[in-house]
A protein has these predicted regions:
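Short, cysteine-centered beta-strand-loop-beta hairpins and adjacent loop/turn segments enriched
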Residues: 137, 176-187, 215-216
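Residues that flank catalytic or metal-binding motifs in active/ligand-binding sites
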Residues: 73-76, 103-105, 144-146, 188-192, ...
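Short beta-strand edge/turn micro-motifs at domain boundaries
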Residues: 29, 33-35, 39-43, 162-171, ...
Length: 222
């Protein structure tokens, strides 16, 4: 066979082989690219889900702590009110200090119920005056806080899970015992309807409405 013809055949086979190898590489490249893209997407999804779980855990912890702190406001109020019912200056000063700590300066408070003329007071000093004047003629008192329900309306946290802003409603059942002269006791049942907000690093009550449900005067030691 002519040498030129053989060279042409060999050259053709070589070019055909090169072309086939190039096509094979081109066919694999999209698949490999797709696999790489899928792997990257899965990594991004995992990171996103991880961040969401992290944020959710932070928010759950913040809501739990907020609920405890909000409930404690009304409990401290009950304790402070009992202190104000005592006659010694030290107890009155402690009760007043707690009021300043749990109430916001723009406090709006009221007392209402069946057979009672609604009383409204503005500011901490206004409510403090009403309480001290009401409890003054009585003996020791005991304000018991029962069932409490917290409804968080708004809650914002920073990147570290710290609360920076919040609004909530607080409902607390009340049972209050007030000693009277002649071995008598005045028992009152009611509900505190309070609104609280988070500002300056703490929760405070800015609105509190005391609803009297029922009351009676009893003779002790009968």
């Amino acid at each position: 066979m002519n040498t030129k013809i053989l060279l042409c055949i060999y050259l053709g086979l070589f070019l055909f082989t090169v072309a086939m190898m190039t096509d094979s590489k081109n066919e694999r490249s999209p698949l490999e690219s797709t696999k790489q893209h899928a792997g990257w997407a899965q990594e991004q999804l995992a990171m996103t889900n991880g961040n969401k779980l992290y944020d959710t855990a932070f928010m759950a912890g913040a809501r739990h702590q907020a609920t405890l702190d909000i409930e404690y406001l009304q409990r401290r109020y009950a304790y402070a009110t009992d202190l104000l019912g005592l006659t010694d200056p030290s107890s009155i000063a402690r009760g007043n200090s707690i009021y300043q700590d749990i109430f916001s300066e723009d406090l709006q408070a009221s007392f209402f119920g069946p057979g009672v003329d609604t009383i409204k007071k503005s500011g901490i000093s206004g409510w403090l005056e009403l309480v001290t004047n009401s409890l003054g003629p009585m003996g020791p008192t005991q304000h018991l806080i029962g069932t409490q329900l917290v409804d968080i309306k708004e809650l914002e946290i920073d990147d570290f899970g710290n609360i920076v802003k919040g609004e909530a409603l607080l409902r607390s059942y009340l049972q209050a015992w007030h000693t009277l002269p002649d071995q008598k006791v005045w028992l009152a049942l009611g509900t505190y309807h309070s609104k609280v907000r988070f500002s300056d690093g703490r929760w405070k009550i800015w609105q509190m409405n005391l609803e009297l449900t029922v009351d009676e005067t009893r003779q002790m030691n009968d």
